[in-house]
């Protein structure tokens, strides 16, 4: 039931005309959804720094991870052309307490992420692409979606040196972090804050730039 999920129809000055996307997000299974002015999507070069320090396994190894995505500067210029964004969240059954090296059981971050949060990661990806399509069909043909974390649609990404294209281009999307979006500040601006290292369920967060 939509009434049992958290919906933030408007935040800031996001136009009422776009509330159909919030309703659609909840209908499609989002735990929470909110509209916000695109100017409240926070971009910070330090987010990309955290892709490299400490280095993420996806860095330079995945098509939708840095440095293979658009630069932070290019994304910031592109973001300036948008006025409305939709932020969505998919809640996990697990909390966000940190795991130390021993708690990881010798597994890589990618393996652990797929094992612990794979269902939510894939659910968020499907949700974002469906909402992007809904916005497109409604006439907002510049709609563009972003997910969270490393893409796990394939067991492993294509060999970048081969020049082969993405195997699932209609489903794969870059993470918000990959283009420099500060997910925590942006979620807070949307009225859907995320708490780090807490006993609250992990909230996988995605974004659709609408118009």
Question: Predicted regions span which residues?
Answer:
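Auxiliary alpha/beta "docking" domains used to position bulky ligands
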Residues: 2-211
């Amino acid at each position: 039931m939509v009434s049992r999920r958290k919906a933030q129809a408007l935040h800031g000055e996001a136009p009422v005309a776009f509330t159909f996307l919030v309703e659609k997000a909840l209908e499609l299974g989002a735990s929470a959804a909110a509209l916000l002015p695109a100017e409240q999507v926070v971009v910070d070069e330090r987010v990309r720094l955290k892709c490299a320090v400490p280095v993420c396994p996806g860095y330079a190894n995945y098509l939708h991870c840095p440095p293979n995505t658009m630069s932070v500067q290019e994304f910031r210029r592109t973001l300036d052309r948008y006025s409305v964004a939709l932020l969505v969240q998919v809640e996990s059954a697990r909390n966000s307490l940190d795991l130390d090296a021993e708690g990881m059981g010798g597994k890589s971050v990618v393996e652990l992420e797929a094992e612990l949060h794979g269902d939510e990661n894939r659910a968020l990806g499907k949700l974002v692409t469906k909402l992007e399509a809904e916005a497109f069909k409604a006439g907002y043909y510049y709609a563009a979606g972003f997910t969270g974390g490393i893409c796990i649609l394939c067991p492993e990404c294509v060999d970048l040196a081969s020049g082969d294209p993405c195997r699932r281009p209609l489903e794969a999307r870059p993470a918000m972090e990959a283009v420099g979006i500060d997910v925590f500040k942006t979620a807070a601006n949307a009225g859907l804050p995320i708490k780090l290292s807490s006993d609250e369920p992990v909230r996988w967060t995605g974004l659709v730039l609408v118009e």
